[in-house]
Amino acid sequence: MRDAIFLSTWFWETHNVTERICMALAQLGCKVLYCEPPMSIVRGRPRPMRDLQKGVYAFQSASVGGRLNQVPLLRDWQAAALKKEIHRAACHIGLKDPLVFYTWWQRGILPLCAQMKRDHFMVHLWLDHRPWADPNCDRFVELSDTTMTIPRSDFHELKAKYGSKVVLLPQAVDFTRLTASTAGPEPDVLTSIPRPRIGYLGYPGTSLNLPLLSSLLKARPDWHFVSVGAEKAVPLPNAHTLPWARPEDLGHYIQGLDVGFLPYDCADEWNLHRVPMKMLECFAFGIPVVSTPLIHFWECKDLIYLGDTADELAAAVQAALDEPADSPKRATRIEIARHHSLESLAAKLRQRLPLDDSSQN
């Protein structure tokens, strides 16, 4: 089994899509070197290498800074230095013929990707819709040996341009960990919030249609909206917040909801094409979900209650609250979430990438 180097945009604690792909690779028996964004030597020292979980190791390299990328000669020198640091760390943990994974969000690492291309099979992860024209996005695809995309609409657009090197990658939910430890009493932070609870278990930033949410909650003061973070989504008495939870504790929050609520602002093209893990995390417990009509989930319209306006979403929430506890829709949602588990993702990665020892770059 070949191993993997992951050039991450984030840090492991975010537990987002890229981190779950690392976990899926580790399930296959790959060793994964998870490279956090480089630390500028002007700002401090890189974090030391550490074990994250079985088979996954975190590493942070040192860089002079992003401004060097504005000078071609210095840019190439810094990319070569970063590559050398990464290879040294890969040798330290004994990686075998590793594939390199990267995303198009990392525009500043394009020179590093070009350097890594000389020695590695390159896997480009296209995780979100591209709502603006950026030539670097195409350059990242061109550098790759395989581009794996999650939004189905982007998959068809890219495949029409680049052919069979573009493959579809399913969104994944950590189904086993999410559902494994949900026994016991409801968390105290939830008990104080009246029912019915409609919840968006993330930070309610600009991706949500906040004016629409405010209109809905004003019209239905008996419904209580729950989000995560320090600040309420809207300044209303029936809007509530929960503290951030560890991934293994998130299931307790989801079980405490009556309805999952995803009122994304679909006037923004990026949101319209979203493939949120929050949808699948709610599905893992079978609870009904109300959402604005995200393109990727149109095929699940019989399992999701949809609406565009405040009035339509209010009707959708009421229909979701009225869904019988023994509705067959609940079992179907759970089965869909299980189909998007890390184990299923691992099987897809094994099928679509040259991970066997005998594979050649």
What are these regions (language model features)?
Residues S153, Q171-F175:
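Carbohydrate-associated surface elements
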Residues M1-R45, L217-K218:
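N-terminal subdomain of nucleotide-sugar transferases
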Residues W244, L303-D311, Q318-A325:
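Conserved acidic donor-binding segment of nucleotide-sugar-dependent glycosyltransferases
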